[in-house]
Swiss-Prot record:
This is Ribulose-phosphate 3-epimerase. Its cofactor is Co(2+); Fe(2+); Mn(2+); Zn(2+). Pathway: Carbohydrate degradation; pentose phosphate pathway; D-xylulose 5-phosphate from D-ribulose 5-phosphate (non-oxidative stage): step 1/1. PROSITE patterns: RIBUL_P_3_EPIMER_1, RIBUL_P_3_EPIMER_2. It is an enzyme of class 5 (isomerase). Binds 1 divalent metal cation per subunit. Active with Co(2+), Fe(2+), Mn(2+) and Zn(2+).
Length: 238
């Protein structure tokens, strides 16, 4: 069984007020924070690194953190690693507060070894594929994953147009692995979320559509309901 998970991408936030921006979307109903890490090599853009994640973790504790005596908003940190040689970053990001390390299939020579390395650090392991990568590459790996990510834009920049022709990949994964968390990332908003939900995605990354919304709660609630409706129709809703 799976559940709807909304993971706003902090790439679309106001970095001058990052902690407050994250509290805003968590209080509006976000489940995870999607943290895009780009190295300027695997993708042309550069975003943020471990010091920012460490700092943000102090502002946004893990759910269930007993030391959170101030009752700060909490969230699961979903780190999307758009980097070359992702193996070299696993230990650092596990230490700085990542809850999940999502690597790109295209960036590693031995994805299964990388999954085992990630899990050995006590965090969840996920694998992403670019639009040009066949979904077939995930079939042997999926039983070992906590999540699969199907990119619905070319990775590297926010605010791109949703690629509807990626939905057959999601449909295939949901049919083969009904209880796997399947994430979509890129161009997701009120107009496109029904297509992603119908295909079988349950983890939704949304950036500008949430962070710049007049009412983030309304957007997040709509997304959750669309995903819940489709999961319910498949008898998969947790």
């Amino acid at each position: 069984m799976v559940k709807p998970i909304i993971a706003p991408s902090i790439l679309a936030s106001d970095f001058a007020n990052l902690g407050c921006e994250c509290h805003k979307v968590i209080n509006a109903g976000a489940d995870w924070l999607h943290i895009d890490v780009m190295d300027g090599h695997f993708v042309p853009n550069i975003t943020l690194g471990q010091p920012i994640v460490t700092s943000l973790r102090r502002s946004v504790p893990r759910p269930g953190d007993a030391s959170n005596t101030e009752k700060k908003p909490t969230a699961f940190f979903d780190c999307h690693m758009m980097v070359e040689n992702p193996e070299k970053w696993v230990d650092d990001f596990a230490k700085c507060g990542a809850d999940q390390f999502t690597f790109h299939y295209e960036a590693t020579q031995d994805p299964l070894h990388l999954v085992k390395l990630i899990k050995s650090k006590g965090i969840k392991a996920a694998c992403a594929i670019k639009p040009g990568t066949s979904v077939d590459v995930l079939f042997e790996l999926a039983p070992h994953l906590d999540m699969a990510l199907v990119m619905t834009v070319e990775p590297g920049f926010g605010g791109q147009k949703f690629m509807e022709d990626m939905m057959p990949k999601v449909e295939t994964l949901r049919a083969k692995f009904p209880h796997l968390n399947i994430q979509v990332d890129g161009g997701l908003g009120k107009e496109t979320i029904p297509k992603a939900a119908k295909a079988g995605a349950n983890v939704i990354v949304a950036g500008t559509s949430v962070f710049t919304a007049a009412d983030p709660h309304d957007v997040i609630s709509f997304m959750k309901e669309e995903v819940s409706k489709e999961l319910r129709s498949r008898d998969l809703l947790d």
